[in-house]
């Protein structure tokens, strides 16, 4: 007879009328009982003949592709002019005094950020914009191209001008070496002084003035430079190591654009007169530059190499035959849907190519991309705006994958210990947080996005003209692309983009100037940055609490008036560093803070309402006695795992599901197991904040017996049969908790200390989790454990009771600065201007 839910509850000791714990609990460790229960609940039955279920509620599993929805009315979000101040460390020091080592190290990491992949795979330009929406290919092409253009205009991307130069908009940083008329301009910066512009083969600045060529040779392989391109390193390697910016002006050569050939550049750029950096002059000269003048000094043409004449250098002078778009003007219409009808609407379609305000030198960058892009909804709640998805997954796959640095994410208990208090809270929203952090230009060749131009994009989609790939500029197949579909799409897009259609129909290659979202390094850098900023804020306002996770910043203060004045001060400070906040998204939470999916108040933490709603929905839709595909189980476990710490039995209750996912087998929910989980998740208990205290109850065990020291009382017992040592220690801890009621226990077992009971026999893990919920553990070495003797059957010998203090930990949550205490038992009427006198130090 299958096990009923009531019987199962009784078995797990979740009912009050269970027998004495010392007899009942060891039974749950019995392998035979665990196996029988698993069979009764149909938990481990992988061989099912019924077809698997691949969808449960909103969770989809194997063989199901979620079709993304294209929205023709997507708006491209606006990006403010984000420019993080380069002297951020000095500004912080002026604000709060000397920075700690940790804060300094973190801020140096992102000024500028560096990226060194082991291997970079270059893809053809046609793969620049992914054909994610085949029905709306042209529309998607232009919307994506507009998004990229917006990012370039906002100073977030570089535009590849030639193999060795790029242009960008916005304010330059000191590590971006300026080019004027294909010539380097040296600026002195307060950060590096003159040593920062040692000429190197790759345009990477070395930190030290000594021997940059040696460094550049070391870095060549990581930057993907071939040995023959390091011509500078080769030419100068015979000389002494110390090359300063103004030491040998006569032997100096610049490789700003193309390193090949005998073209020697005039050395006046290195003379001190041209060091003055005049932005206004540069802008005017740029606007009159034609692409013909942008040829390299060595006489090599420097436009895209692998691209047909559609983007050849002469086009901005007005030669029509170089531009695919303008060729239609002089050709006869081929039908009523010929593109020439659209192109003849305008006399002046504007420039073929736009150039940025600044031109800089970059390492050799091929006319390729390293990742594809496409658009999706900004988030599930905002479908009117688009978000750019960049696929740089090549850096986290395969044998040459980059191992991203690990960083600490606060766990639930640490978070609760830290934030559960009676403070008033508000959260700040950093707009486009990732795009605040500047990347070194040396990373550009690895992070390239772009598009091959409309003609090749359309040709790739229509298989007929795919063969004549090499002759796209020629007249005979100019009209191959004319179709009703393309004509109608372009006419509609003309309303939105106007003359820009021409600009967007040209090929372009862009590299990231700020950190992109699709690279594993970015979350790490963002976490380092915001935690350093919060650390500075905490030290500037010692009677408040500031905390961050990624781009989510929260501020807490004793009263609402205090919080408002803190908010004003912190906002002004962040804006002075160049951090853009989104004022519309500032949320005031009162006393219960919503953060990282939790609601955290003085009583502890619980999952947010929308997660509770999802849980209810999940159980409503969960089928019984039907095998569910393991991929769906993975998604169910993702949701249930988030809320597991708030249930009686915690993670151990989900172990059967974990096991089936690991074995990649289907899982069948029996009515009893579903009812058990359902009851677990419909009554959630808050996770409370741990309190400091003295440990006066100790537990210890041997495989055959257990012993407790409760104050001056000693208790011992034996097991019916010998048990594995970890199981015995866990049982002893449960007995100590149930006999004494103490919520701080001393134990010498690391597994019990870790509070992860998923590796124990299933029934025991579930029961122990419930008994030990809310218990804090202190480590006591075996030699000092007062419960050691009773566990070995010796009751007469009394070791002295230790005075073992328990201090709640906030984990590695980057609280390097001392933070104030926020004891919730203080009266609420603390005057808001008075810093509290009790300072709390992280353990």
From Swiss-Prot:
Activated by host HSP70 and HSP40 in vitro to be able to bind the epsilon loop of the pgRNA. Because deletion of the RNase H region renders the protein partly chaperone-independent, the chaperones may be needed indirectly to relieve occlusion of the RNA-binding site by this domain. Inhibited by several reverse-transcriptase inhibitors: Lamivudine, Adefovir and Entecavir. Keywords: DNA replication, DNA-binding, DNA-directed DNA polymerase, Endonuclease, Host-virus interaction, Hydrolase, Inhibition of host innate immune response by virus, Inhibition of host RLR pathway by virus, Magnesium, Metal-binding, Multifunctional enzyme, Nuclease, Nucleotidyltransferase, RNA-directed DNA polymerase, Transferase, Viral immunoevasion. The gene is P. Mg(2+) binds at residues 429, 551-552. Residues 218-243, 291-315 are annotated as: Disordered. GO terms for molecular function: DNA binding; DNA-directed DNA polymerase activity; metal ion binding; RNA-directed DNA polymerase activity; RNA-DNA hybrid ribonuclease activity. This is Protein P. It comes from the Viruses. One of its GO terms (biological process) is DNA replication. Disulfide bonds: none annotated. It catalyses: DNA(n) + a 2'-deoxyribonucleoside 5'-triphosphate = DNA(n+1) + diphosphate; Endonucleolytic cleavage to 5'-phosphomonoester. The lineage of its organism: Viruses, Riboviria, Pararnavirae, Artverviricota, Revtraviricetes. Residues 357-600 form the Reverse transcriptase domain. Belongs to the hepadnaviridae P protein family. Residues 178-346 are annotated as: Spacer. Hepadnaviral virions contain probably just one P protein molecule per particle. Residues 347-690 are annotated as: Polymerase/reverse transcriptase domain (RT). Gene3D superfamilies: 3.30.70.270. Its EC number is 2.7.7.7, 2.7.7.49, 3.1.26.4. Terminal protein domain (TP) is hepadnavirus-specific. Spacer domain is highly variable and separates the TP and RT domains. Polymerase/reverse-transcriptase domain (RT) and ribonuclease H domain (RH) are similar to retrovirus reverse transcriptase/RNase H. The polymerase/reverse transcriptase (RT) and ribonuclease H (RH) domains are structured in five subdomains: finger, palm, thumb, connection and RNase H. Within the palm subdomain, the 'primer grip' region is thought to be involved in the positioning of the primer terminus for accommodating the incoming nucleotide. The RH domain stabilizes the association of RT with primer-template. Residues 1-177 are annotated as: Terminal protein domain (TP). Multifunctional enzyme that converts the viral RNA genome into dsDNA in viral cytoplasmic capsids. This enzyme displays a DNA polymerase activity that can copy either DNA or RNA templates, and a ribonuclease H (RNase H) activity that cleaves the RNA strand of RNA-DNA heteroduplexes in a partially processive 3'- to 5'-endonucleasic mode. Neo-synthesized pregenomic RNA (pgRNA) are encapsidated together with the P protein, and reverse-transcribed inside the nucleocapsid. PROSITE patterns: RT_POL (PS50878). It comes from Hepatitis B virus genotype C subtype ayw (isolate Australia/AustRC/1992) (HBV-C). The record marks 63 as: Priming of reverse-transcription by covalently linking the first nucleotide of the (-)DNA.
């Amino acid at each position: 007879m299958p096990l009923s839910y009531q019987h199962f509850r009784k078995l797990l000791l979740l009912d009050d009328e269970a027998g004495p714990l010392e007899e009942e609990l060891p039974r749950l460790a019995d392998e035979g009982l665990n196996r029988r229960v698993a069979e009764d609940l149909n938990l481990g039955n992988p061989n099912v003949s019924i077809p698997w279920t691949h969808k449960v509620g909103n969770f989809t599993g194997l063989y199901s592709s979620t079709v993304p929805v294209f929205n023709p009315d997507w708006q491209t979000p606006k990006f403010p002019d984000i420019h993080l101040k380069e002297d951020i460390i000095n500004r912080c020091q002026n604000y709060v005094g000397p920075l700690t080592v940790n804060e300094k190290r973190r801020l140096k990491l992102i000024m500028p950020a560096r990226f060194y992949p082991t291997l970079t795979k270059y893809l053809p330009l046609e793969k620049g914009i992914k054909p994610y929406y085949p029905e709306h290919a042209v529309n998607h092409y232009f919307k994506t191209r507009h998004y990229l253009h917006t990012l370039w205009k906002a100073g977030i991307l570089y535009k590849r001008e030639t193999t060795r130069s790029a242009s960008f908009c916005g304010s330059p940083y000191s590590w971006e070496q300026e080019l004027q008329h294909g010539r380097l301009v040296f600026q002195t910066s307060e950060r590096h002084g003159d040593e920062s512009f040692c000429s190197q083969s790759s345009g990477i600045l070395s930190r030290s003035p000594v021997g940059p060529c040696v460094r550049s040779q070391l870095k060549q392989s990581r930057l993907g430079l071939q040995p023959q391109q390091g011509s500078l390193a080769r030419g100068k390697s015979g000389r002494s190591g110390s090359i300063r910016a103004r030491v040998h002006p006569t032997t100096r050569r610049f490789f700003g654009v193309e390193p090949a050939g005998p073209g020697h550049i005039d050395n006046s750029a290195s003379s001190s007169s041209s060091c003055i950096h005049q932005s206004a002059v540069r802008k005017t000269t740029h606007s009159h530059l034609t692409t013909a003048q942008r040829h390299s000094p060595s006489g090599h043409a420097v436009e895209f190499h692998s691209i047909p004449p559609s983007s050849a250098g002469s086009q901005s002078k007005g030669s029509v035959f170089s531009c695919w778009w303008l060729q239609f003007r002089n050709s006869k219409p081929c039908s009523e849907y010929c593109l020439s009808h659209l192109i003849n609407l305008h006399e002046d379609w504007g420039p073929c190519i736009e150039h940025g305000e600044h031109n800089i030198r970059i390492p050799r960058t091929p006319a390729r991309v390293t990742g594809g892009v496409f658009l999706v909804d900004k988030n599930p709640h905002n479908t009117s705006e688009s978000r750019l998805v960049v696929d740089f997954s090549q850096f986290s796959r395969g044998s040459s994958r980059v191992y991203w640095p690990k960083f600490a994410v606060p766990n639930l208990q640490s978070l609760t210990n830290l934030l559960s208090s009676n403070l008033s809270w508000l959260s700040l929203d950093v707009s486009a947080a990732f795009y605040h952090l500047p990347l070194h230009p040396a990373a550009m060749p690895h992070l390239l996005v772009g598009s091959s131009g409309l003609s090749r994009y359309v040709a790739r989609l229509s298989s007929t003209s795919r063969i004549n790939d090499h002759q796209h500029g020629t007249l005979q197949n100019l009209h191959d692309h004319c179709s009703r579909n393309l004509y109608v799409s372009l006419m509609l897009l003309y309303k939105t983009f106007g003359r820009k259609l021409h600009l967007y129909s040209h090929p372009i290659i862009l590299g990231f100037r700020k950190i992109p979202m699709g690279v594993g390094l970015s979350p790490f850098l963002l976490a380092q940055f915001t935690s350093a900023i919060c650390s500075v804020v905490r030290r500037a306002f010692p009677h408040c609490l500031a905390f961050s996770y990624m781009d989510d910043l929260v501020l807490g203060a004793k009263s609402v008036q205090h919080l408002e004045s803190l908010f004003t001060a912190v906002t002004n400070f962040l804006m002075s560093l160049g951090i853009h906040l989104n004022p519309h998204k500032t949320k005031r939470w009162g006393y219960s803070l919503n953060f990282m999916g939790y609601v955290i108040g003085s009583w502890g933490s619980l999952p947010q309402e929308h997660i509770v709603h999802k849980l209810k929905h999940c159980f409503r839709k969960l089928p019984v006695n039907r095998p569910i595909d393991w991929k769906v189980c993975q998604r169910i476990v993702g949701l249930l795992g988030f809320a597991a710490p708030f249930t009686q039995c915690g993670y151990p209750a989900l172990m059967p599901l974990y096991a089936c996912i690991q074995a990649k087998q289907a899982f069948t929910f029996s009515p009893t197991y579903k009812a058990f989980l359902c009851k677990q998740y419909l009554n959630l208990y808050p996770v409370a904040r741990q309190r400091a205290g003295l440990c006066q109850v100790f537990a210890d065990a041997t495989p055959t017996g257990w012993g407790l020291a409760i104050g001056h009382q000693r208790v011992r017992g034996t097991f019916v049969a010998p048990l594995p040592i970890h199981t015995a220690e866990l049982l002893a801890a449960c007995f100590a908790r149930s006999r004494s009621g103490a919520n701080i226990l001393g134990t010498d077992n690391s597994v019990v200390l870790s509070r992860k009971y998923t590796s124990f026999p299933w029934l025991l893990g579930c029961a122990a989790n419930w008994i030990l919920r809310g218990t804090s553990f202190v480590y006591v070495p075996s030699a000092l454990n007062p419960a050691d003797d009773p566990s070995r059957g010796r009751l007469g010998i009394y070791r002295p009771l230790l005075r073992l203090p328990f201090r709640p930990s906030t984990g590695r949550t980057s609280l390097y600065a001392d933070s104030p205490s926020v004891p919730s038992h203080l009266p609420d009427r603390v005057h808001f201007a008075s810093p509290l006198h009790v300072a709390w130090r992280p353990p």
